[in-house]
Amino acid sequence: MRLAQRYGIALVALLMVGATVLFFWSENIINYENIKFNSPVELVWWSRDMSWNYDVQRQCGIHTCRITNKRSRRPWARGVLFYGSNIKTGDFPLPRNEHQIWALLHEESPRNTPFVSNKEFLRHFHFTSTFSRYSNLPLTTMYLPSGEALTSKDYYVTFDGKSKYGYRPSTSVVFLQSDCDTMSGREDYVKELMKHLPIDSYGSCLRNRDLPESLQKDYLNNLYSPELLRFLSEYKFMIAIENAACPDYITEKFWRPLIMGVIPIYFGSPTIKDWEPNNKSAIFVNDFQNPQALVEYLNKLADNKKLYNSYRQHKLNRRNPISNKKLLHNLVTRQYHIGDSSPGASLFEKFECAVCYHVINTARNVKADLRHYNCPLEPVYAKMEGQKIPQNVADWRAAMEVGQCQAKVLDEFFRRDIGFNDAEFDAELNRRIEGNNCSNSSNT
């Protein structure tokens, strides 16, 4: 009996000890989870161009995020953020931390950072925000303020109203560009058009007219100013040639004339017809064999009211102004567009919150591929007379080939996972170029 009693007491004591251990263990787990839940997710901007102190705490939905440019916080950061135009080839956070992702924001064409549009570079990123519909935070229609901007008649001028300006040719074509010498050979093509057609050219490229004095001061930073839109809306056609011909790379050059009720003469994104408001909203340079053939069609269109207005159904069809379901769906679901002044609506804030959400809810092994920023290695340009090529196409081809080699060098350094500087990067790049060791294989 005494033995049984002692055994029972020992058992009770053992159970109490076990319960105590279990209690403190569970408390530790709960406290750990609370710390993990309550601590903000940290993200670090990796850009020496951000010379100012940036350290903010932002509420991204249900998640609290801390975003900073203090590099000393990298060991605790869940993500490192890069802005494409500011990336320096000798400045990357290596060795990488296993718990971190790399995130890339780049809405521009590859002219400034040609290495970005290569699979060898892209595959080291877990999150992207680019013009491509396939990126994690697509910016394909970012330059279209709203669907209402397309259908509104705020700047609309009737066909007869456009035709009353007797001092202009009936074709009434405008060209407004100050970014010259582009990968797409924009000025070369416009020069060809000018041989067959009078074109009013404003801006720094091929200028033959001056903007009104009130618009000359800072029009590049006011591309959608009401005064500028009213001035341009008097024209029938506007030349809209992108800097580069990348899938889904669509800028204000396409949307602005549509907003004004002016027909765009477009060259650029090969996927542009996926995004036009209706099946016939723009004139596409690629549909014509050469500039002269395009001019012949413009002359026909400019004198035919019914045919001209058939391109402006987004303004004239009240029942169904926009028939493109893909575009309509994008306008409802997209996360960013210009002109949104609400709190937290800037491009960088949207990107930061999207990355914050991503690191919490998505597996780290998901990585970017070539579709996330797909620009061709070989510069693409419009067909010109007599199979001419743009004046500087060879220079752009060489720049893109160097960019491809840069991507391969970066890929090698990233795989080694050891820090490197500009001098080491340049030495390896020069070694490859001098040894003809940069493959020109297909970028697929």
From Swiss-Prot:
Keywords linked to the UniProt accession: Glycoprotein, Glycosyltransferase, Golgi apparatus, Membrane, Signal-anchor, Transferase, Transmembrane, Transmembrane helix
Predominant subcellular localization, coarse grouping: Golgi
Cytoplasmic side: 1-6
Pathway where it operates: Protein modification; protein glycosylation
Segments on the Lumenal side according to the record's topology features: 28-444
GO molecular function, one term: alpha-(1->3)-fucosyltransferase activity
Gene3D superfamilies: Glycosyl transferase family 10, C-terminal domain (3.40.50.11660)
Transmembrane intervals: 7-27
Organism: Drosophila melanogaster (Fruit fly)
PANTHER family in UniProt: ALPHA- 1,3 -FUCOSYLTRANSFERASE, ALPHA-(1,3)-FUCOSYLTRANSFERASE 10
Lipid bilayer topology: Single-pass type II membrane protein
EC class of the enzyme, as a word: transferase
Protein name per the record: Alpha-(1,3)-fucosyltransferase B
Residues carrying sugar: 279, 437, 440
Enzyme Commission code(s) on record: 2.4.1.-
Family note: Belongs to the glycosyltransferase 10 family.
SUPFAM superfamilies (UniProt xref): UDP-Glycosyltransferase/glycogen phosphorylase
Subcellular location field: Golgi apparatus, Golgi stack membrane
InterPro entries referenced in this protein's UniProt entry, alphabetically: Alpha-1_3-FUT_met (IPR017176), Glyco_tran_10_C (IPR055270), Glyco_tran_10_N (IPR031481), Glyco_trans_10 (IPR001503), GT10-like_C_sf (IPR038577)
UniProt GO BP: fucosylation; protein glycosylation
GO cellular component: Golgi cisterna membrane; Golgi membrane
